[in-house]
Amino acid sequence: MIGALARKLFGSANDRRVKGYQTRVAAINALEPEVAALSDEALRARTAEFRAELAAGKTLDDLLVPAFATVREAAKRTLGQRHFDVQLIGGMVLHEGDIAEMKTGEGKTLVATLAVYLNALAGKGVHVVTVNDYLAKRDSGWMGQIYGFLGMTTGVIVHGLDDAQRQAAYACDITYGTNNEYGFDYLRDNMKYRLEDMVQRGHNFAIVDEVDSILIDEARTPLIISGPLDDRSDFYNTIDTFIPRLDKSDYDVDEKQRTVTLTEAGMEKIETLLRDAGQLRGESLYDVENVSVVHHVNQALRAHALFQRDKDYIVRNDEVVIIDEFTGRMMQGRRYSEGLHQALEAKEHVTVQPENQTLASITFQNYFRMYDKLAGMTGTASTEADEFFDIYKLEVVEIPTNLPIARLDEDDEVYRTQQEKYAAILAEVERANKRMQPVLVGTASIEKSEVLAEYLKKNGYKQIDFTDPKGMDKLYAAARAGKPAKLFAVLNARFHEQEAYIVAEAGVPGAITIATNMAGRGTDIKLGGSLEMRIQQEAAHITDEAERAAKITEIKADIERFRDIVLKAEDEIEIEPAKGNKPAKTAKRPGGLYIIGSERHESRRIDNQLRGRSGRQGDPGRSKFFLSLEDDLMRIFGSDKLDTMLTRLGLKEGEAIIHPWINKALEKAQQKVEARNFDIRKNLLKFDDVQNDQRKVIFDQRIELMKEDSVAETVTDMRHTYIEDLVAKYVPEHAYAEQWDVAGLKAEVERVVGLDIPVDEWAKEEGIADEELITRLERVFDEHMAAKVGQWGSDVMRYAEKSILLQTLDHLWREHLVMLDHLRQVIGLRGYGQRDPLQEYKSEAFNLFQEMSSHLREAVTAQLMRVEIIPPDQPQELPPMEVHKMDPDTGQDEMALANVTLAPAQTTDKADRDPNKPETWGKVGRNEDCPCGSGKKYKHCHGRYA
């Protein structure tokens, strides 16, 4: 109460911050006449003037007022749009590295140009991040007119570009692109072997559009570049046949936690099935040797019990394609990891693709935290303000709307069953359609959108494609005649290519649009329809200028007439029935776009995004949610109590309960889910930070190595450290000479580097110490390497050293990632032993990293000591074996040796191999037993150094 009173007297922190910008807004407005008087050339010249002032010592903050005034004038001259005062405030928030929360239709795209231009003056590059390729191309072309007018270059990063095109785009002053493309380019850059092949040029400043969608909704989804492992499709198909043979009592499903576990009875049944199929080793499913089998069984269970077709994924062209739960879009090319995607493929009887090994990965949380300055824009961020500040140190600033919001948000209607709910939605859609009010029905999944579509079809409605001119002509003709055409369109992941057109036309009189979650759609719904879309469809093909101008005038008049129809499509509802002579009391509901929500989402933000599609820029509109006790959120969070209450109230079939209390109860349930999801994301980030710290060390190390003309000093240091570790292993510190394992040391040296060094003779010398052994070994190793340099030349050896070092580092890093993944899966069990899983993970991950570093020194030393290089002009008995690293974008061989070829592998008969002389082994298959007699596979023994 006291807090509310204080806010009334002094305003909220947000109000005070917004008020603090007014001085600079006034200064920008005061400059407007002066800037407007400049010629185009003089206005363009201001960019060079600003850059000169920066070079002379001024800061970007010093230039904010004149730079913003310049952009505002350039926008007026190129786009015919002038930044409102509130948009100037939004630009200041972005420049300060925070989140500008701006309602739908307030011009976020235009706002970004202010901060983008100002920060691009520094010449370090500015990245504007969008959620899809369409928006990246649209915004770069649209806003690029402003930047181009002011003498700045604009690039765009979309799927399908080669490295040269990407380099050119990143070299521009301003680069537009999707979050996925930026992240994958970063990962690919850190798999390159030459600095000149890298495409990004640092992470200076990024503005993220739909920041909540990217940094919250997708925060738990890592970007992964992977390579195929051995084919195990038969095993997945075998395991999949067992799951339908289980009863529901054989496993427990926790929908809140998204987990499924076998009961005792289920475990016994699975063990019997596995044993009969010859897939179980030992007696128990949980024996150590069955760890992989347990993993596959768990993933198959999850695929059947937790994942639903047409909700979590769709099946198309013999593929399982993931559906983004927040946007309803197909995530083409994305695959679930850890074998889950293969389990889904087996479940749906499509081709099971090989499992992949992670080659490189990063989460959006860690990628975007690399930027020196990060900012974001969205229509809905305040509900997640704590998370934005906690994880990204971004404050959310609510920007006032240019005009007051005139949308009416009504209380939810709650029904007993989904069938009753759908019937009520259908009735509401019919009422709105009769008065020509456009309706947008939001659904939580593709499945639900298609259920609603079937309801409409059964009641005489016809589905059309809003991108089809014939279908739209019918809708326009009906709108002109003022008669409902009973036509509807469906927007979901199946038709995502057309989503911008479908959304843009959702404001036409009588239009009915069914859409999955509207998060991140990025396209305004204008009352009466979209002028740009109609010109593109109806006038773009007209070549005659006069004819084209006439057509555009006709379209404009059409849209104005349609807008007027929509604004007048008010609804009069009875709020009190007639009593005696007293007439019924009625109330008017506004026209405009009518938003109908068919289900509450787990996140209030997604619901707010749906509501926010209506009421743009002061337009009237209304929104209402229709719910049932069978909806996921209601079912999982307390529908039993509500059901009992509705029964006591005597609620009949088809009747709904409408009360603000219901809305508050649902909001509390949503807050609980949001808090739980935040905790999950926060906890996952703590674990991912461990891997991220190691990733930064490896990636920074790679870049430093690529910068060096020669890594000779680095490999020499590695060689010497390896020798120190080797001697310490066989010659314990402060031990007597009699306790030294000289034979072991000699054998290890011979095994790893192939040199017969008289270590045993040295050890017999009087008074020799371990330091002397180290010195002598270093001298022998160094002389051996010097001989190779003398034989093949310094340039050739320097190239070989760098190639081998980078390749080996990459190989071991990939193996390390697999180890970290496995560790992360099981580390939670340490909690049962009263130990903190996070601290245990940090400790174990550090030990693994140290181990990897040790293996790197050993492997690089071994390979360089053994490498034989053959100049191309020397005759060869066998075809050469070359080292290749194919770039995934261009297909270029990044590891092509310009004038050098590694020596061919010789094939030797197994009978002629001497276990103690690796030089007699020739080529050994990776899965053969190692010729040394260890009993291990070659790839796990000497093959590690091959």
UniProtKB/Swiss-Prot annotation:
GO CC annotation: cell envelope Sec protein transport complex; cytosol; plasma membrane
Membrane topology: Peripheral membrane protein
InterPro entries named among the record's database cross-references: Helicase_ATP-bd, P-loop_NTPase, SEC_C_motif, SecA, SecA_CS, SecA_DEAD, SecA_motor_DEAD, SecA_preprotein_X-link_dom
Pfam families from the UniProt entry: P-loop_SecA, SEC-C, SecA_DEAD, SecA_PP_bind, SecA_SW
GO BP annotations, alphabetical order: intracellular protein transmembrane transport; protein import; protein targeting; protein transport by the Sec complex
Molecular-function GO terms, alphabetical: ATP binding; metal ion binding; protein-exporting ATPase activity
Keywords attached to this entry: ATP-binding, Cell inner membrane, Cell membrane, Cytoplasm, Membrane, Metal-binding, Nucleotide-binding, Protein transport, Translocase, Translocation, Transport, Zinc
Co-factor(s): Zn(2+)
Family affiliation: Belongs to the SecA family.
UniProt name for this protein: Protein translocase subunit SecA
Protein species of origin: Rhodopseudomonas palustris (strain TIE-1)
